[in-house]
């Protein structure tokens, strides 16, 4: 790959974020890229080893999120913020949601160059099967208001557990005399 923006510059002096911006600018607006594809193209351009990319990957992802010129487009796709007007960003999100209502799209199997040789690595792009089972019907679960009978049964079960520990026969009856307490509060301390 040849990027005209960096003609005459030493590749070792370029940052991954600069190369990512140049790659996305060269591809154009309708060619958003998956994060893994973007990283692979950066690696090919810079000629870095797998170990070098693995080491720099967390820093690059942080820079990608904090740099104001990139925008996540969902499903781990990235584009340049300059491609979208502020009002258009919401429209893009809405159109993505409308597309999901239609026919299901077949998912492409993506190969991650970083996970192939490492059995312990986790591929975060894999969807959970639980996510696929989610439907709007399951989102509309109705919750009943608090049932006073449930509270009563909780109190009864608590009382029965207490009775197992200390039988009711062992409790002493205590009379609370509220007048005595009021009298004590009214009295002035003697000095």
Swiss-Prot record:
InterPro entries xrefs: Asxl_HARE-HTH, RNAP_delta_N_dom_sf, RpoE
Keywords of the record: DNA-directed RNA polymerase, Nucleotidyltransferase, Transcription, Transferase
HAMAP family reported in the protein's UniProt record: RNApol_bact_RpoE (MF_00357)
Recorded family membership: Belongs to the RpoE family.
Species whose genome carries this gene: Streptococcus pyogenes serotype M6 (strain ATCC BAA-946 / MGAS10394)
Assembly and interaction partners: RNAP is composed of a core of 2 alpha, a beta and a beta' subunits. The core is associated with a delta subunit and one of several sigma factors.
The protein, known as: Probable DNA-directed RNA polymerase subunit delta
Gene encoding the protein: rpoE
Origin organism lineage: Bacteria, Bacillati, Bacillota, Bacilli, Lactobacillales
Gene Ontology MF annotations: DNA-directed RNA polymerase activity
Biological role stated in the UniProt entry: Participates in both the initiation and recycling phases of transcription. In the presence of the delta subunit, RNAP displays an increased specificity of transcription, a decreased affinity for nucleic acids, and an increased efficiency of RNA synthesis because of enhanced recycling.
Gene Ontology CC, one term: DNA-directed RNA polymerase complex
Gene3D superfamilies assigned to the protein according to its UniProt record, in alphabetical order: RNA polymerase, subunit delta, N-terminal domain (1.10.10.1250)
